[in-house]
From Swiss-Prot:
Interacts with nAChRs containing alpha-4:beta-2 (CHRNA4:CHRNB2) and alpha-7 (CHRNA7) subunits. Interacts with CHRNA4 probably in the endoplasmic reticulum prior to nAChR pentameric assembly. Interacts with KCNA2/Potassium voltage-gated channel subfamily A member 2. Keywords: Cell membrane, Cell projection, Disulfide bond, Endoplasmic reticulum, Glycoprotein, GPI-anchor, Lipoprotein, Membrane, Signal. It is a lipid-anchor; GPI-anchor. GO terms for biological process: acetylcholine receptor signaling pathway; regulation of neurotransmitter receptor activity; synaptic transmission, cholinergic. This is Ly-6/neurotoxin-like protein 1.
């Protein structure tokens, strides 16, 4: 084997291998949903969106997305919602509450407190 070819093979072995992200992907009218799926190669985020129709009724949507912006919308004129993002395999499972979810819970409690 020529020295140049050997050097090329050593360089290839040292390169990191790109691996597709695994996320839960689903839309469910309930507390949570689980459906592990391999995302396309250009996807780098798992996203979870929770839309609250009432304090006890919500829709959870989970997906693979190429870019993601975490948001909290208080639902002044419509439904309240939160979007959270993460970047490791199956990170959008049940897990702990995200800061965005906690902030929305406080907003909903403050709104309910103001109604009584």
């Amino acid at each position: 084997m020529t020295p140049l070819l050997a050097l090329f093979l050593v360089a290839l072995v040292g390169l990191p291998v790109a691996q597709a992200l695994d996320c839960h992907v689903c839309a469910y009218n309930g507390e949570n949903c689980f459906n592990p799926m391999r995302c396309p190669a250009m996807v780098s985020y798992c996203m979870t969106t929770r839309t609250y129709y009432t304090p006890t009724r919500m829709k959870v949507s989970k997906s693979c997305v190429p870019s993601c912006f975490e948001t909290v919308y208080d639902g002044y004129s419509k439904h309240a919602s939160t979007t959270s993002c993460c970047q490791y395999d199956l990170c959008n499972g049940a897990g702990l509450a995200t800061p965005a979810t906690l902030a929305l819970a406080l907003i909903l409690l403050a709104t309910l407190w103001g109604l009584f």
